[in-house]
């Protein structure tokens, strides 16, 4: 008589549970190469948007570590435009795994946001990561088409995961997700107003270091450079005198004077060669050294202030391993190029980059959807200096009064950053010591900021307030 082990019984029970939930068996990720053992399930695969065009978006879904049946669902989108949410958000910032120091395995991210929520990462639009289209014109994308495709994606993804339709839905992201997330939220609210059936249970949006208003975000870059001693008094003064950013455009020559362009070019030359402008604090990882050590299967990690500054190269190496792509059900079209974080295929509308997002955010907040904007204070690419002003402008336009004045918030009895709240629906917070990718550089503070938002709580302004992530 055959003897059935407890392990076999457990595996059968897991399989039955997966089938019972109605989740897609073919998308179940059994285990990633080099992955530590975990108790939660993960899924990955494609959602077809247009069969005639052959346009499909790739996703990676991770259940909450505990109680996934009752935890909310959080969508995360990276920016760019044109950068991978799977590679960036999932495997570098807030997902459950980080690549190991030599890029051939994974280690646990002890501050993963799946401690608080189910997580969904989507490579959007088509042409980013493993998302694709068989029609080359689809790679001419913009804000409107990106939001439209993501709305279709979510509707069809919920058909794959019907049990999650009723869960609270939070939309989150960073950088150019300052465009992606508000426009998707706006599309969802419009869909809900028209639908007589299913409605998205949207509960809030949170965006880190977001591009919101180009004519304010751009001058903030040079204010940051000057205030951090990264450019000279002469260059800083020249930019202040010569540059009128009120009609600045993304495309060169930016609709500014030649003297202004000369000054900002000089500022860029001074600051970008030896400093990571996305995080001005840590040392750089030099690719030639990192890649050489990867080939030798040695630790390429060069730790600086507790941050693995070479993780970008480790992630690149790991996600290009064929066995990893097979485990993720990725690259089903056998793309003729290596996976990379940001797309070289995408031709994204430069005009859309100029769009002021405040009217869209205003509509969202008027629909009683809470908005939390947060900024890593060591990011010079979309600095908090501009974002703080922009959020204040939005609050003024909404006629919101200050409900919590600007002041420190705490985490683990240390200053986590500074925050201000307007009208009980709009919050701006800095994260102390964090970069453009907040969750990567300050993972514990980022998880705390995220968890409090999900629970509808304010960031604690006293050290003795007991709060759990």
Swiss-Prot record:
The record's listing under InterPro entries reads: AB_hydrolase_fold (IPR029058), Peptidase_S10 (IPR001563), Ser_caboxypep_ser_AS (IPR018202)
Where would you find this protein in the cell? Secreted
Enzyme Commission number(s) from the entry: 3.4.16.-
**Glycan attachment points:** 134, 255, 331, 347, 461
The kind of enzyme this is, by top-level EC class, is: hydrolase
Entry GO MF terms? serine-type carboxypeptidase activity
Query: SUPFAM superfamilies this protein is in?
Result: alpha/beta-Hydrolases
Question: Keywords in UniProt for this one?
Answer: Carboxypeptidase, Disulfide bond, Glycoprotein, Hydrolase, Protease, Secreted, Signal
Q: Which Pfam families match?
A: Peptidase_S10
> Function of this protein?
Probable carboxypeptidase.
From the Swiss-Prot or TrEMBL record, give the protein name: Serine carboxypeptidase-like 41
